């Protein structure tokens, strides 16, 4: 995620967007990042794997923030519950490549390839927003784009979550939300092989993101969970 956002620093985006230039940059950065990932971090799991990942964000009245992503990987994970805590253990060891000699091979002291991208963004030394998602390899594109909507285009948290996105998390095509305006869709189609992919309840074609944000001016707190998911929710203290 850090590398993907850093690559945007070299791109001058038109004001008032995101316009076609922004989505072209998003698609290029995500495709390059995914290619780098395969070359240096091993193969990823199949996109049809069941989603057993949960992400939560918390902000307290003092502006302290937490972004936490937890995953079981397979349904019920390893099917082992720790007796002292009741926590269900995942079976994330299968993220490793069992074959020796690959970037993601199982070895002592190594961390397996994962998709989780919890992130806290700071502005002027203070936590500004916390964000993350569930949804396998679609997590990074979702978190990346929403973060850019907030950072580069000055959107409100609500507008950023409702804005249509793309997904370039592997494969030969870029998934494009048909709600994107025609100039954006045409520019993407001219540059990359694309496929129209609607935002629906299931499958989660664009991940299941959530975020909390603290307004640095008024100190107000805002939170948004995935607008399509019946499994997302939010709680506020009055």
Where are these regions (language model features)?
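Proteins synthesized as precursors that undergo proteolytic processing into mature forms
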Residues: 1-37, 51-203
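Cofactor-centric catalytic regions
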Residues: 179-238
